[in-house]
């Protein structure tokens, strides 16, 4: 079923849904650059104002997946993405990136999909680059990296070439749109398990249901009540969990895992270099709130990856991976492997 751009815009003005097949058609036109920048901007702004439905988000994500450059991972057992929508304004160091190394050292395979900082001081690509990781590998090299080190980093612009058709509109609008919530739904490696942080409480239920429709196996969508798009140490965290096809929604608290509640102020950074130093301090085993929040998020990721039976078990495994030096060693392996692959090795 097709819909004209003008009809779609009128629907958003009237706060009416664009149905699944219509959204597929509309999104393909947008991603192929068939609409003018003015019409694209009007439609994505209209969707934002009326609030995107689960069906609209799911259809848009399907099109982005369809047009992406995929990473073929042979064995997706324990494969997990740790990702956030961004836009929480917290400007913390790269917690999910640090948690990725810890989770990989504790038995998960991590396929992280990220880009440069837009709303934050340091995006995952910025800090990975500052750590010496080669982020511009082709899909087949990333698949080898996951097989060899348990970690693959997918630089989003390399895997979503069609995004170039909407990038100028996004930049000029300068506000959150549908595309901010699509990125975490479109992992090019098809990770069946995911820990996703979101920037608004309403997105917990929306994103976990979109993941359900998109075929995810074990997903946890989280929102820290202090505004963080991570599992938070500073407040309760809302959780939407998809497991065995069923969705449950609940809250978790740092105290549930024997962790002291603490402010996020000590986690803030101004530059990718500061984020790099804080991340390295955690991997080197230094104590403090940065270590605690990484253990918390890595532990939940290990639960999402079905490596740990419970979140508490995951946190214990995360601590052990840091204490043994295995997490730092995993970073060093990734740097060496990506450089070798970039050189053709």
UniProtKB/Swiss-Prot annotation:
Reported cofactor(s): Mg(2+)
Keywords: Amino-acid biosynthesis, Aromatic amino acid biosynthesis, Glycosyltransferase, Magnesium, Metal-binding, Transferase, Tryptophan biosynthesis
Name the UniProt record assigns to this protein: Anthranilate phosphoribosyltransferase
One GO MF term attached to the UniProt entry: anthranilate phosphoribosyltransferase activity
Tagged with keyword Manganese: no
Binding site for Mg(2+) 2: 229-230
Name of the encoding gene: trpD
Organism: Paracidovorax citrulli (strain AAC00-1) (Acidovorax citrulli)
EC category name: transferase
GO cellular component, one term: cytosol
Binding sites annotated in the UniProt record for 5-phospho-alpha-D-ribose 1-diphosphate: 84, 87-88, 92, 94-97, 112-120, 124
GO biological process: L-tryptophan biosynthetic process
SUPFAM superfamilies found in the cross-reference section: Nucleoside phosphorylase/phosphoribosyltransferase catalytic domain, Nucleoside phosphorylase/phosphoribosyltransferase N-terminal domain
Entry's family note: Belongs to the anthranilate phosphoribosyltransferase family.
Record: residues binding anthranilate 2: 170
Positions with a binding annotation for Mg(2+) 1: 96, 230
Pfam families xref list: Glycos_trans_3N, Glycos_transf_3
Protein's pathway: Amino-acid biosynthesis; L-tryptophan biosynthesis; L-tryptophan from chorismate: step 2/5
Quaternary structure and partners: Homodimer.
């Amino acid at each position: 079923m097709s819909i004209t751009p003008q009809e779609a815009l009128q629907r958003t003005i009237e706060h009416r849904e664009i149905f699944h097949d219509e959204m597929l058609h509309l999104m393909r036109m947008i991603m192929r650059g068939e609409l003018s920048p003015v019409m694209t901007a009007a439609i994505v702004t209209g969707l934002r104002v009326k609030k995107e439905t689960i069906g609209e988000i799911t259809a848009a994500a399907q099109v982005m997946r369809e047009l992406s450059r995929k990473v073929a991972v042979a064995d997706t057992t324990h494969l997990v993405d740790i990702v956030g929508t961004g836009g929480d304004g917290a400007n913390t160091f790269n917690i999910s990136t640090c948690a990725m190394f810890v989770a990989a050292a504790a038995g998960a395979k991590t396929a992280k999909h990220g880009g440069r900082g837009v709303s934050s001081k340091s995006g995952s690509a910025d800090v990975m680059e500052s750590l010496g990781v080669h982020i511009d590998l082709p899909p087949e090299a990333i698949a080898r990296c996951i097989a060899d080190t348990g970690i693959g980093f997918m630089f989003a612009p390399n895997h979503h070439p069609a995004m170039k058709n909407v990038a100028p509109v996004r930049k000029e609008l300068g506000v959150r749109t549908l595309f901010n919530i699509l990125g975490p739904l479109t992992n090019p490696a098809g990770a069946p398990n995911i820990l996703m942080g979101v920037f608004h409480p309403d997105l917990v239920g929306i994103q976990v249901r979109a993941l359900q429709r998109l075929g995810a196996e074990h997903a946890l969508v989280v929102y820290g009540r202090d505004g963080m798009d991570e599992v938070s140490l500073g407040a309760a965290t809302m959780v939407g969990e998809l497991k065995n096809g069923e969705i449950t929604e609940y809250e978790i608290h740092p105290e549930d895992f024997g962790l002291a509640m603490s402010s996020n102020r000590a986690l803030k950074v101004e530059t990718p270099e500061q984020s790099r130093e804080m991340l390295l301090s955690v991997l080197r085993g230094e104590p403090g709130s940065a270590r605690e929040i990484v253990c918390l998020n890595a532990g939940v990721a290990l639960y999402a990856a079905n490596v740990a039976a419970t979140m508490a078990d995951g946190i214990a495994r995360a601590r052990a991976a840091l204490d043994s030096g295995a997490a730092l060693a995993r970073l060093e392996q990734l740097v060496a492997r990506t450089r070798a692959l970039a050189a053709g090795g």
